[in-house]
C-alpha cells in the first residue's frame, strides 16, 4: 500500500482565518500560481469499515476519499482541525493533482480563499454536507452530496482533475461500463 504523509502539508503562503463560507478557511498570504501545490493531505489510510468506526467516535475531522473503499483521515490527535480546513466551493480554486495533492486551479490572489469542490474526492452516495452550501458561486449546487461527481456540469468543470479513482470512474461512465466497485 502507498504511504502518505503523517500530517497534512500546507504551503507556507497559506494562512487559516475566519471564512465567509464556514469556520476558518485557508487563505493565500501571497499570490499562488496556477498549478502550484496548495496542500498535500496526510493521515492514516482507512477502509470503508475502519472509516465508519472512526466516524462513530469522532465528530470533527478532516478526511478525503483516495480510492474506491479507501479514505485518508487526519489523526485528530495531531491535526490542526481547530485551526481550520479547506472549505467547499462549487467552483473551487484548487483541484486534484493526485489522490492527496491539491494544486491551484487558477492563480490565487493575496487574500483569496483556497477552496475545493468536495466532488473532486467524494463518491459516498450516503454522504451529504451538513449544511447548505454558501460558496456564492454562480455554479452553486446548494445541496452537496457524494454523488455530485456524476453530474455532467461538474465533470466538465474539472475534467481530468478529480482524484484518480474518480477520473477512472468517469472514463468508465463515458464508455458506458461503470459497475459499482
Please place each PLM-identified region on the residue numbering.
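Catalytic cores of histone-lysine modification enzymes
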Residues: 2-97
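C-terminal SET catalytic tail plus cysteine-rich post-SET Zn-binding segment of SAM-dependent SET-domain
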Residues: 90-181
Amino acid at each position: 500500500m502507498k504511504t502518505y504523509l503523517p500530517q497534512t502539508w500546507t504551503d507556507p503562503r497559506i494562512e487559516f482565518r475566519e471564512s465567509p463560507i464556514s469556520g476558518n478557511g485557508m487563505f493565500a498570504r501571497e499570490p499562488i500560481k496556477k498549478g502550484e501545490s496548495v496542500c498535500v493531505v496526510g493521515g492514516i489510510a482507512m477502509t470503508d469499515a475502519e472509516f465508519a468506526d472512526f466516524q462513530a467516535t469522532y465528530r470533527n475531522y478532516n478526511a478525503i476519499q483516495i480510492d474506491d473503499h479507501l479514505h485518508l483521515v487526519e489523526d485528530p490527535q495531531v491535526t490542526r482541525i481547530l485551526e481550520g480546513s479547506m472549505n467547499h466551493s462549487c467552483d473551487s480554486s484548487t483541484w486534484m493533482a493526485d489522490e492527496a495533492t491539491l494544486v491551484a486551479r487558477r492563480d490565487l490572489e493575496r487574500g483569496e480563499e483556497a477552496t475545493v469542490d468536495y466532488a473532486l474526492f467524494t463518491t459516498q452516495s450516503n454522504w451529504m454536507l451538513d449544511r447548505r452550501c454558501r460558496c456564492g458561486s454562480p455554479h452553486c449546487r446548494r445541496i452537496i452530496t457524494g454523488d455530485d461527481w456524476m453530474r455532467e456540469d461538474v465533470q466538465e468543470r474539472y475534467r481530468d482533475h478529480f482524484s484518480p479513482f474518480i477520473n477512472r470512474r468517469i472514463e468508465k461512465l463515458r464508455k458506458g461500463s461503470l459497475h459499482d466497485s
